[in-house]
Amino acid sequence: MNFNRHVVVTGGSGFLGINLVRYLLERGWKVSVLDLEPCRPEFATRIHMVIGDIRDPDAVRQAASGADCLVHAAAALPLQDSATIRSVDVDGTRNCLEVAQREGLSRFVHISSTAVYGIHDQLNTCENAALDGMGPYGRAKAEAEIVCRKFRSPDFAVAILRPKSFIGPERLGIFGLLYDWAADGRGFPLPGGGNHRFQLLDVADLCHVIVQALTSAPEHANRTFNIGASEFGTLKSDFQAVLDYAGFGKRVLRLPSSPAGWMLGLAHRLGLSPVYPWVFRNLTVNSAVDITRARNLLGFHPSYSNRDALIRNFEWYLRHRDQWRRQTGITHTVPWAQGLLGLAKRLF
């Protein structure tokens, strides 16, 4: 592919964005970022930063000027209200596509989610499986994919990536609960005990395949791809690796699924727990996708297993833990306020 290696990253100040911008800069790309939040200080003199909303055509145009391609990683989060989720994830995606096409960009990589499949007790889900998005977030992501497919052409390739839950340096959010409990010498309870296989993904592997989607032949990239780890065990065994690494001799513990689900659901509705129903239900079934298409067309060969990715993320957490002690929020880059879970932690 013949271009100047100038890429726009929407959502460049989020968890994926931080890792992707760093990955691209290390490999000689010119990077422009569009985000509501400023970039990390380490990037300030190395990128073109545009503070703005992906729903604003002028902001997207300013970021896309002179670029060859765009990675659309900006998205509303599942904890936000349904109207905001749809506006950002559907209307924002459409706006980015329209501007990118008008500005003459040749490649668009849309970061979707396996949430478009809904929650099914299934391994090796293929890209042609029926879409059954769970909740406002999953439904909006599925609708955004429909928008993306309408823009595909030989001159404007639109790759849709559906990553599993991805982790690594800078990731906190729901995984911050596990790391906090492990670092404090606590066991970790899982509804149902975690005796099912659950595929994750290291953010470094996701960054690698994004670049593959940017640089592969259009006839290969102009498709939809599942992205996940190739090596993973049960949720119990993979989470236990974090507790073992912490070195306190603690174990993953089983909570009865139905009572735990009822209590967590009530606590979330009352604003006393960050664990929303989709997370709970997703953690109680087998969940993995088939990555054969990405392997064959994009050369995707994940370097990290679930355990590798979890330990790598936990090591980063331990190095940076002090800076997060008084910060909470709803994004993936800060700890979530534990609410009642912080009190329950004392029991384990």
Question: Where are the model-predicted features located?
Answer:
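NAD(P)H-binding glycine-rich loop region in Rossmannoid oxidoreductase-like domains
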Residues: 51-91, 99, 114-119
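Glycine-rich Rossmann NAD(P)(H)-binding loop
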Residues: 168, 190-196, 223-232, 243-246, ...
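C-terminal amphipathic/interface module of NAD(P)-dependent oxidoreductases
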Residues: 275-348
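Conserved Rossmann-fold NAD(P)-dependent oxidoreductase catalytic core, especially the SDR/UDP-sugar
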Residues: 95-137, 151, 159
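Conserved beta-loop-beta element that borders a ligand/cofactor-binding pocket
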Residues: 145-169
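N-terminal Rossmann NAD(P)H-binding glycine-rich loop of SDR-like oxidoreductase domains
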Residues: 7-27
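Mid/C-terminal beta-alpha module of Rossmann-like enzyme folds, strongest
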Residues: 216-275, 291, 311-312, 324-326, ...
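Substrate-positioning beta->alpha
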Residues: 95, 143, 171-177, 192-214, ...
